[in-house]
């Protein structure tokens, strides 16, 4: 069985999702992102998005594709080394 050796970090996309979400003007809230994700068929609530952005929740490949479509970025942008400020 696979053991995650990254401590509490369960994804590398969360920091990028948060940075991209916050880059919108006006800033997109986690609730607004959850609402947009539902339009693409992904049912996540604000709390799930918060856990993803903090690296506390795993993200599936299907979820990554929907996040990318919703945020209008490539999947590669979401899984690249976390964005720098």
Residue ranges with predicted function:
Residues 26-51:
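Short alpha-helical DNA-recognition segment
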Residues 53, 63, 79-82:
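DNA major-groove recognition helix of helix-turn-helix
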Residues 15, 31, 47, 61-64:
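Short alpha-helical elements of helix-turn-helix
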